[in-house]
Amino acid sequence: MKYLFLLIVLVYSAVGLANPALDEQASDYQLAKTEQELAAEAVVDKLIMAYNAQNIRQFIELYAEDVEFYMYPQTLMFKGKEKLIERYGLMFKKMHCLKATSIKRVTHGSIVIDHETSEICSKEPGVVDKRSEFVTSYQVEAGKITKVVFFR
């Protein structure tokens, strides 16, 4: 009985893995992003590039004037571009390197949720002294980020 069960599981697994129709369905699903989702992802991609280049002007351009930053679940960290410039402008000036990488992304409508890694060189260029991993949610409306939620 034990061997019969293992044989059934093995055959079922082989059939499932060898079925190209299942692969096509999965890739069709991956390609089925809406224009809104693609546009939201493009904004977040530009944001990550500006962050990594430590280009405060390009970075700030991607945010709405009244952007809100939260720590999950509902703790308001700050609101508005002025506070954003204070916080990130200083960091961009002080750090020798900043590198964020999206390692997994889920997009639904205007919301992009990234599982990200971050590396910072605060003492000398090229020597990473802080690494972190976190999840960030970006809400994008009319090409601007209106809300950011950090999950740590």
Where are these regions (language model features)?
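Short, cysteine-centered beta-strand-loop-beta hairpins and adjacent loop/turn segments enriched
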Residues: 93-95, 120-130
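Short beta-strand edge/turn micro-motifs at domain boundaries
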Residues: 131-152
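Short, surface-exposed coil-to-beta transition loops
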Residues: 98-100, 115, 129-135
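Positively charged n-region of N-terminal signal peptides that target proteins for export
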Residues: 1-4
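A short hydrophobic beta-strand element
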Residues: 109-118
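Short, low-complexity N-terminal intrinsically disordered segments enriched in polar/charged residues
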Residues: 18-53, 57, 61
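A solvent-exposed, acidic/Ser-Thr-rich amphipathic alpha-helical stretch
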Residues: 56-107
